[in-house]
Amino acid sequence: MPAHSFRIAAIPGDGIGLEVLPEGIRVLEAAALKHGLALEFDTFEWASCDYYLQHGKMMPDDWAEQLKQYDAIYFGAVDWPDKVPDHISLWGSLLKFRREFDQYVNIRPVRLFPGVPCALANRKVGDIDFVVVRENTEGEYSSLGGIMFENTENEIVIQESIFTRRGVDRILKYAFDLAEKRERKHVTSATKSNGMAISMPYWDKRTEAMAAHYPHVSWDKQHIDILCARFVLQPERFDVVVVASNLFGDILSDLGPACAGTIGIAPSANLNPERNFPSLFEPVHGSAPDIFGKNIANPIAMIWSGALMLEFLGQGDERYQRAHDDMLNAIERVIADGSVTPDMGGTLSTQQVGAAISDTLARLD
């Protein structure tokens, strides 16, 4: 019998989040049943543009108090620009979660699966398998700044970037700790110290200082422009890529999955490693209002994000790790069989793909 029950706040959000999140829960429940895990899901209807239209805000005032009692947040997608401007929907929900729950680690796995046509020539399964570790609360995505002389010819816009020693060091430590557990044990630091004369030389200095504590982990630093080029030309050289710049990380974490064939299956985790607050797990894709209601949304990213959630919650518990591995194996087999949605060349519906992965998982040895 399960020794501990994890409580999970399920927030579908907008658009296809409403369609893919139930499939993620379906597969998580199948994994829990197989491996003797106890998961409890409660669904919240806020953090959506429809809620904003009804209440004038994305979430209730006590949202943090409600969610603090949960171990994790399983999130679908947010934004519907025809209803609510993006900066309102994102800053009123997802970015609040990241900052107020100190989810300072953003994890974006990048992996080429069998059966997924690679966008890069002559790449095979195993050539692309790395992780982007992105600082999630600082960098360029701050709300510090303003507009001077607004609506005149002398208008000036200032947007500040924030890099703190605490923020820089803790994301570096997470990245080096992660690399130490991986087979290749290599960290690549994304920088631009030849162009950004203050923040990036500081980042380079802290990276070198952190690396000194990890003699068994090799590392290098690459400027963001050539790093993007090498994602395309030499993806096999990467293992753990660490980024303090939120802007650089945002770009790399979409470029990586695109190089591996599709952003449509890419997962992400927003972690508070100390577990003082719930961590959040979500697909990289957005709410895709244009396909909402057509039952063709790809649920794989949602399901893969659920696997990341189990791995994090388990804290090394073999049952949770096996459940994570089974979910990935089931995803891999379903993709290889061609049992996928139209965006990947298949004919299955959202629910049919979710059912196929759930059934495949149940049959794994």
UniProtKB/Swiss-Prot annotation:
Keyword line: Cytoplasm, Lyase, Magnesium, Manganese, Metal-binding, NAD, Oxidoreductase
Signal peptide positions on this chain: none
Catalytic reaction equation(s): tartrate + NAD(+) = 2-hydroxy-3-oxosuccinate + NADH + H(+); (2R,3S)-tartrate + NAD(+) = 2-hydroxy-3-oxosuccinate + NADH + H(+); (2R,3R)-tartrate + NAD(+) = 2-hydroxy-3-oxosuccinate + NADH + H(+); (2R,3R)-tartrate + H(+) = (R)-glycerate + CO2
Thermal dependence summary for this entry: Thermostable. Fully active after heating 10 minutes at 65 degrees Celsius and retains half its catalytic activity after 10 minutes at 72 degrees Celsius. Inactive after heating 10 minutes at 78 degrees Celsius.
Keyword Metal-binding: yes
A Pfam short name: Iso_dh
Cell compartments where the protein resides: Cytoplasm
Keyword NAD attached: yes
GO cellular component, one term: cytoplasm
SMART domains xref list: Iso_dh
PROSITE patterns: IDH_IMDH
Gene3D superfamilies registered for this protein in UniProt: Isopropylmalate Dehydrogenase
Residues engaged in binding Mn(2+): 225, 250, 254
Molecular-function GO term, any one: D-malate dehydrogenase (decarboxylating) (NAD+) activity
Cofactor binding, note field: Binds 1 Mg(2+) or Mn(2+) ion per subunit.
Function recorded in the entry: Has multiple catalytic activities. Apart from catalyzing the oxidation of (+)-tartrate to oxaloglycolate, also converts meso-tartrate to D-glycerate and catalyzes the oxidative decarboxylation of D-malate to pyruvate.
Family: Belongs to the isocitrate and isopropylmalate dehydrogenases family.
NCBIfam families assigned: TTC
Official protein name in the record: Tartrate dehydrogenase/decarboxylase
Native source organism of the sequence: Pseudomonas putida (Arthrobacter siderocapsulatus)
